[in-house]
Swiss-Prot record:
ATP binds at R269, S270, E271, E356, I357, S358, S359. Consists of two distinct domains, a catalytic core and a N-terminal extension that is involved in tRNA binding. The lineage of its organism: Bacteria, Pseudomonadati, Pseudomonadota, Gammaproteobacteria, Oceanospirillales. The keyword Ligase applies. GO terms for molecular function: ATP binding; serine-tRNA ligase activity. Belongs to the class-II aminoacyl-tRNA synthetase family. Type-1 seryl-tRNA synthetase subfamily. The keyword Cytoplasm applies. It is an enzyme of class 6 (ligase). L-serine binds at T238, A239, E240, E292, S392. This is Serine--tRNA ligase. It catalyses: tRNA(Ser) + L-serine + ATP = L-seryl-tRNA(Ser) + AMP + diphosphate + H(+); tRNA(Sec) + L-serine + ATP = L-seryl-tRNA(Sec) + AMP + diphosphate + H(+).
Amino acid sequence: MLDIKALRADPEAIAAQLKKKGYELDVATFSSLEERRKAIQVETEQLQQARNSVSKEIGQAMKSGDKDKAAELKAQTATLGDDLEAAKTQLTQVQEELESLLEGIPNLPHASVPEGKTEDDNVEIRRWGTPKQFDFEPKDHVDLGEAMEMLDFEAAVKITGSRFAVMHSDLARLHRALTQFMINTHADLHGYTEVYVPYLVNAHSLKGTGQLPKFEADLFKVPVDKDSGNNDLYLIPTAEVPVTNLVRDEILNDADLHKKFVAHTPCFRSEAGSYGRDTRGMIRQHQFEKVELVHVCRPDISEQVLEELVGHAEVILQKLELPYRTVILCGGDLGFSAHKTYDIEVWLPGQGKYREISSCSNMWDFQARRMQARWRNPETGRPELAHTLNGSGLAVGRTLVAVLENYQNADGSVRVPDVLVPYMGGKTVLKKA
């Protein structure tokens, strides 16, 4: 959520910044609501003062024994009380309208975010590795997995529906190996604290990280028995939600920052609006797994922390020897809650192009304001909003796709990357039994 004080001070300047994201701020509506809020707030304060003043007069009239005046003043108090309650109701309504408007406004883009409307306008920052030149026509992961009888989409359709997968034997083990390798690297090499979190979260948590109310259509909602006293829950679209909410409503000591969390979870997305896109294979699924990295830090270091975060995700690809490129997202492709984002795209021979495998974002104080995640500044002694960042380190399914396609052999077998061999019990090749 944006700082409403900044929005009140100069809504036109905020609107100009938001245009980089392709968002048109309704300044007229905001200004109208603000004027109403201020007028009703002044009226409320005046009514409160008037009632307090009359209440004092009642006390004086009672002391002097003037019962008639006291009765008259009590009638005035009752009228003022009714007017005050009506004004408070109006003020609450206007504040709720303002809150609803604010919840729909995206985060401001960083000054370094390039102009642009779509992913075609993203700017490449660097590349690592060279795509392998095969002396045969490389297959995609679907053909490879099905030929080895380790990847079964038909079974998934039978069990659940489209955009799900069933993995067997060594492919399932390779998927697990990737997960363990990623977590171990981030925990042991990069100093992250591993956390295990719920896969179901409440609406408050999703609101805190920015998925609600705007993106409810992308979520899987799980109705809960109202008699239990619980509200409906949602399957997590990313571990970013439960992990970042660990600091919701907290005031962290400076000595406790910055925090670095790593979590492995399944993720669930309805992929609303993705009809017809990536219908083949494991690129875009309703259920997939990710190793998520979350940082909570002081505001003065969040820009350098973003660079660190991207570097940690890149290390995984380097250790797997998978070619990739890193791009900075343009304003039009930037996420709702993001201030600045780098995407890491891995080379997929089966598609002949780079595809996103990690998205690393600095959310600035946008999520922290929604969650009231704060730290105590030792210089002032006062609580201030922290900065939050997150990124995939990496998307496990897409990494598996990249390994299959980049490490394939002419006979349809797949070599296991050297760094994963210990996780595979020494197995070096995946092939049909």
